[in-house]
Each structure stands twice: as C-alpha cells, then as structure tokens.
A protein has these predicted regions:
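Bacterial Sec-dependent signal peptides at the C-terminal "C-region" and cleavage site
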Residues: 5-20
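C-terminal active-site subregion of NodB/CE4 polysaccharide deacetylases
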Residues: 16-80, 86-91, 155-249
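Short loop/turn segments at strand-loop or loop-helix junctions that form parts
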Residues: 25-29, 108-109, 146-148
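A short acidic, helix-capping loop that chelates divalent metal ions and anchors anionic groups
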Residues: 32-33, 113-118, 151-156
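Active-site flanking residues adjacent to catalytic metal/cofactor-binding acidic residues
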Residues: 81-82, 145
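Acidic (Asp/Glu)-rich catalytic clusters
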Residues: 94-101, 126-144, 199
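A short, conserved beta-to-alpha structural element at the edge of catalytic cores
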Residues: 100-123
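Histidine-centered catalytic micro-motifs
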Residues: 142-150, 186
Length: 249
C-alpha cells in the first residue's frame, strides 16, 4: 500500500469491477435544498482534491475492459451523475473539461425533450434536452441508461419492466450513434427479476448505491451529498480501498 497525505490506496488496482476502483455517485449540482444536491463550490473542491491527489478519472467501460486485459491508470476513480439534470451541462461539464476529467452520466431518456422550449421539469429540477446529451457524449463523457421514466422497476409487470430497461438503451444509442453499455437502477431497486431484465437487454454492467458489491451488475457507489469536504472524500476513498485490499482486491 502507498500513502498520499494520509490517503491509503492500493498500488495495484484490482481488475475486478468496483474493487479497488471507487465509484462516486452524484445527482445534482446547484443551490437548492435537496440533500443530494452538491453546491458548485463543493464540486470544485472535490474535483480539485482528486486532481491534486493524483487520481485519474476513468469510465465504467474502461473499468470493465480491465477485466479482459485492458489497462487502467494508477489511482483510478469513476465519477457518475444520475438522472440527467440540466446542471450536468451548465455546471458539471465545464468543470470536468477544465481539469481534463471525465464522468458517466445516467440519463432518463423519457425526460429528454427536443429543445429548450419543451424542456422537462420534474422534482423541481429541469432536465437535459437531447442536444445537450449529445454535447456530453461529444465531449468524451460516457452516457448510460437510467430507464425511460425513472420508475420503481420491481413494481412493474414483466413487459413494462423490459420496456423501461430496453427502450431507454435503444433510444440513447439511436440518438447518440454509439453503444450505451451501463445502467443505473432507479431508487437502487434491483431485485433478481430487475437484474435479469438488465442483463437480457444487453448491458455490460449496472451500478447501485451503497448496497452493492463488486459484481458487474451490482457495482457499489459512494454517495456524494451536500456538505462533503475534501477531507471527508479522502476518508471515503481510503475506506473503499482498505476494504478492497482486505478482501483480496
């Protein structure tokens, strides 16, 4: 193990997904009162910490490719942003590009309107429109699926479940012209039947919240919420790597 300023990390990252490669789960960036909304200045501090501590942001595709002999940079970390809020374009993307960092954005395809005049507002937040989703992809960001309508999948009939999982991927791939290989379970709802539908739809992997593991369809993430300081993030990442190392990662 090696140490940067008190942060213990595995010097040899495990090729198994989610073990030794922490995945951070963000939602929104802004000034509202939602506890899952991170303030812009907090995101700045977190991204600056990752950069100064020598972390390299990678995509989920790069992590899974490592299972097949692909190479990951040292001290890899995955940044993910769920739901596809407009701040992904206005707040997150500029900050990532400024630092040469990358992230995975999980999009609710049914919430993406064609233009700003018809932009969807839900949960008191505005969502991306299709040209903004394309701009994320064109900037080198990874796009994943978060279903068509952000429903609790275990409550749906088999046909509706399959449609939510399958149609979102198909729509995103058709619009972007590139593969969409990763899925995020809405509400962390991942029953055995839901997982089977995700696998059958052709995804390579899926992410959950804190109740996950290193399995490629239940990849665990660390929840980022309002109030997390760089010192807090240092502790979270240290604990993640300690666990992976102890388990043989």
């Amino acid at each position: 193990m090696a140490s940067w300023g008190g942060l213990l990390v595995c010097t040899a990252l495990c090729a198994a997904c989610g073990r030794g490669v922490p995945i951070l789960m963000y939602h929104s960036v802004g000034g509202d009162s939602d506890p899952l909304t991170v303030a812009p200045e907090e995101l700045d501090a977190q991204l600056d910490f990752l950069e100064s501590a020598g972390f390299n942001t990678v995509t989920l595709r790069e992590v899974l490719d490592a299972q097949d002999g692909g190479k990951l940079p040292r001290h890899a970390v995955v940044l993910t942003f769920d739901d596809g809020y407009v701040d992904a374009s206005t707040q997150v993307l500029p900050r990532l590009l400024q630092r040469g960092q990358k992230a995975t954005f999980f999009i609710v395809s049914g919430f993406c309107a064609q233009d700003a005049a018809t932009r969807v507002t839900k949960w008191q937040k505005q969502f991306l429109i299709w040209p903004e989703v394309r701009a994320l992809a064109d900037a080198g960001m990874e796009i994943g699926s978060h279903t068509v309508s952000h429903l609790r999948l275990s409550n749906l009939s088999g046909a509706d479940l399959r449609a939510q999982v399958r149609d979102s991927r198909a729509t995103l791939q058709s619009y972007l012209g590139k593969p969409v290989d990763f899925f995020a379970y809405p509400y962390n709802d991942q029953s055995r039947w839901v997982r089977r539908a995700v696998e059958t739809a052709g995804y390579r992997g899926a992410v959950v919240g804190s109740r996950g593991n290193s399995d490629s369809f239940t990849l665990q993430r660390l929840t980022m919420h309002r109030g997390i300081t760089p010192a807090d993030l240092r502790s979270m990442l240290s604990e993640n790597w300690e666990t992976a190392y102890t388990e043989g990662g």
